[in-house]
UniProtKB/Swiss-Prot annotation:
BP term (GO), one: photorespiration
The protein's name in its UniProt record: Ribulose bisphosphate carboxylase small subunit, chloroplastic 7
Top-level division of the source organism's lineage: Eukaryota
Gene (UniProt): RBCS7
Summary of subunit composition and partner proteins: Heterohexadecamer of 8 large and 8 small subunits.
Similarity remark: Belongs to the RuBisCO small chain family.
Known role: RuBisCO catalyzes two reactions: the carboxylation of D-ribulose 1,5-bisphosphate, the primary event in carbon dioxide fixation, as well as the oxidative fragmentation of the pentose substrate. Both reactions occur simultaneously and in competition at the same active site. Although the small subunit is not catalytic it is essential for maximal activity.
Provenance organism: Flaveria pringlei
Transit peptide in keyword set: yes
Note: The basic functional RuBisCO is composed of a large chain homodimer in a 'head-to-tail' conformation. In form I RuBisCO this homodimer is arranged in a barrel-like tetramer with the small subunits forming a tetrameric 'cap' on each end of the 'barrel'.
PANTHER family reported in the protein's UniProt record: RIBULOSE BISPHOSPHATE CARBOXYLASE SMALL CHAIN 1, CHLOROPLASTIC, RIBULOSE BISPHOSPHATE CARBOXYLASE SMALL SUBUNIT 1A, CHLOROPLASTIC-RELATED
InterPro entries xref list: RuBisCO_ssu, RuBisCO_ssu_dom, RuBisCO_ssu_N, RuBisCO_ssu_sf
GO CC entries: chloroplast
Keywords: Calvin cycle, Carbon dioxide fixation, Chloroplast, Photorespiration, Photosynthesis, Plastid, Transit peptide
Length: 173
């Protein structure tokens, strides 16, 4: 024999929810045909004729900001200040032979693209002033005048490299 509360609950459930019978009809939604109007999109079509492709021969690129002219000491110090404001740890690396991307140990592109640079001393944990980094840069340039030298910023919380740019190149590059 069924108890009274079970009978009441069954009746209440049947009245509360209607069974699912399928998808709703599209007739309830207004249908408007949109015209493909591209006049509001940005276009540089009129300027394409005056654009040029950057010549790849004799103008190799390295890291971030490498498309710009060589940075001055003041500009480098500002980049290091940016790195320090973001609480990244500065580090210097140098390379004596291959300043460009090349593949010696691996044939597939990746984070390091088959190249490893030598670290100058240790990462500068606790560095708070760009003058400290610039002093280390000058020492590295004095020790290895024909080296590519880059400044890297590491985020020690996320444990990733956040910025990397060339600070010095050998003569002729």
């Amino acid at each position: 024999m069924a108890s009274i509360p079970a009978t009441v609950a069954t009746v209440a459930q049947a009245n509360m929810v209607a069974p699912f019978t399928g998808l709703k009809s599209n007739a309830a939604f207004p249908v408007t045909k949109k015209v493909n109007d591209f006049s509001t999109l940005a276009s540089n079509g009129g300027r394409v004729q005056c654009m040029k492709v950057w010549p790849p021969l004799g103008k190799k690129r390295y890291e971030t900001l490498s498309y710009l002219p060589n940075l001055t000491e003041v500009q480098l110090a500002k980049e290091v200040d940016y790195l320090l404001r973001n609480k990244w740890v500065p580090c210097l690396e140098f390379e004596l032979e291959h300043g460009f991307v090349y593949r010696e140990n691996a044939r597939s592109p990746g984070y390091y693209d088959g190249r490893y640079w030598t670290m100058w001393k240790l990462p500068m944990f606790g560095c708070t002033d760009s003058a400290q980094v610039m002093k280390e840069l000058q020492e590295c340039k004095k020790e290895y005048p024909q080296a590519w030298i880059r400044i890297i910023g590491f985020d020690n919380v996320r444990q990733v490299q956040c910025i990397s740019f060339i600070a010095s190149k050998p003569d002729g590059f």
